[in-house]
């Protein structure tokens, strides 16, 4: 079984967006989550303690020659408990206006889910949100602006697989929190613009970061 989060074209509407699932090793695919022709999947996180539980973030966006649009009615957070066959929104406690989103469920505690959310920058409504009940409700734990400073291009969040209170955020810079997102320290690793992070599930000190 393979899942793909497809963001889709940036410059116009298309039906080729959302969450796709393959049951035959990639030979054929089914779109299991589609919102609208302007909203693609920006992230997918699987609960490794129960792989039928999936969390997906959808992002409505357009990059036009004269402006960039991030956010809209299509942006939102979704959960499936049956391997992607059915989805429902989980937005209790989140801002009404959502832009780009990233999500990560903790392998150390399946009830804890981290959500990095772009929202109205003028009102500073975005930041890092945490759910302690598997997405039923959310609370903002940090409004530190640098966590979403390059949200159009890349914002990522990664829960440490062995410690539910350690979480990493990648943006123009890389950050780590060891208190569940309340405070942050910068990670220095050569060039900035960090895009991805792998943490060894058997040894959290063994990591690979890419820019």
What are these regions (language model features)?
Residues 1-211:
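Beta-propeller blade termini and top-face loops
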């Amino acid at each position: 079984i393979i899942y793909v989060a497809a963001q889709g074209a940036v410059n116009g509407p298309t039906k080729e967006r959302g969450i796709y699932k393959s049951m035959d090793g990639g030979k054929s695919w089914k779109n299991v989550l589609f919102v609208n022709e302007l909203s693609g999947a920006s992230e997918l996180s699987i609960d490794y303690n129960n792989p039928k539980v999936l969390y997906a973030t959808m992002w409505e966006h357009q990059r036009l020659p004269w402006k960039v649009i991030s956010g809209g009615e299509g942006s939102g957070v979704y959960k499936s408990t049956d391997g992607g066959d059915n989805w429902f929104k989980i937005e209790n406690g989140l801002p009404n206006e959502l832009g780009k989103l990233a999500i990560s469920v903790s392998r150390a505690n399946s009830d804890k889910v981290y959500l990095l959310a772009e929202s109205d920058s003028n009102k500073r409504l975005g930041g890092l949100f945490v759910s302690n009940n598997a997405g039923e409700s959310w609370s903002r734990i940090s409004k530190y602006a640098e966590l979403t400073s390059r949200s159009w291009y890349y914002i990522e969040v990664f829960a440490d697989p062995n410690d539910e209170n350690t979480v990493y955020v990648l943006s123009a810079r890389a950050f780590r929190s060891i208190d569940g997102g309340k405070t942050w320290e910068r990670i220095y690793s050569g060039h900035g613009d960090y895009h991805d992070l792998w943490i060894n599930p058997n040894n959290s000190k063994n990591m690979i970061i890419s820019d």
